[in-house]
A protein has these predicted regions:
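N-terminal positively charged helical leader segments and presequences
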Residues: 1-84
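Structural motif
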Residues: 26, 48, 90-92, 110-111, ...
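Residue-level signal for inorganic ion chemistry
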Residues: 29, 91, 128
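Fold-independent oxyanion-binding glycine-rich loops
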Residues: 30, 51, 72-74, 93-95, ...
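Flexible, glycine-rich phosphate/dinucleotide-binding loops
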Residues: 56, 78, 98, 144-145
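Acidic/glycine-rich phosphate/pyrophosphate-binding loops and surrounding catalytic core
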Residues: 84-106, 135-138
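RNA substrate-binding interface of SAM-dependent RNA methyltransferases
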Residues: 102-148
Length: 148
């Protein structure tokens, strides 16, 4: 059971200002959460999920260190979700520090300038990932990539 305080805290991470202050962001949905966990590039702080999702992924979750795993009900996930219909899992991850020393030798680097729509930015990132582009640089005028 999520407390009101914790619910409000998770909801506050939907705002860029709080994401920047805390260095945390929310990931929603089974595929996104599992992709981030499997990448081992992001530290997972908390997972909120339905019982059946937790049981299905129990082996993977047992390997996580310092991650608080909380069983949640549908209505609780709906409260903390930014989506109109909540998924079976929502997780809180640490944002990565920007890497200003990008290894560009023999690699394609995608540079984005003033992409202001978070949905468009997310689409570009997913397509770049599909094509194997590892380096993406966003100008200061771009949307928050943790909101894409």
């Amino acid at each position: 059971m999520l407390s009101k305080t914790h619910t409000k805290y998770i909801q506050s991470l939907q705002h860029k200002k709080l994401r920047d202050e805390t260095g945390l962001f929310i990931a929603e949905g089974p595929k996104v959460v599992m992709d981030l966990l499997n990448s081992r590039k992001f530290i997972c702080k908390e997972i909120f999920a339905l019982n059946n999702w937790l049981q299905e992924h129990s082996k993977h979750l047992s390997l996580l260190k310092d991650t608080v795993v909380t069983e949640a009900e549908d209505f609780e996930l709906q409260k903390i979700s930014s989506l109109s219909t909540a998924h079976a899992v929502l997780a809180v991850f640490e944002k990565r520090k920007p890497d200003y020393k990008i290894e560009t030798a023999f690699k394609i680097t995608l540079v984005l300038d003033t992409i202001q729509d978070p949905g468009n930015l997310g689409t570009i990132i997913r397509i770049a990932d599909w094509f194997g582009i590892e380096n993406i640089v966003c100008s200061t005028g771009c949307a928050d990539m943790y909101n894409a």
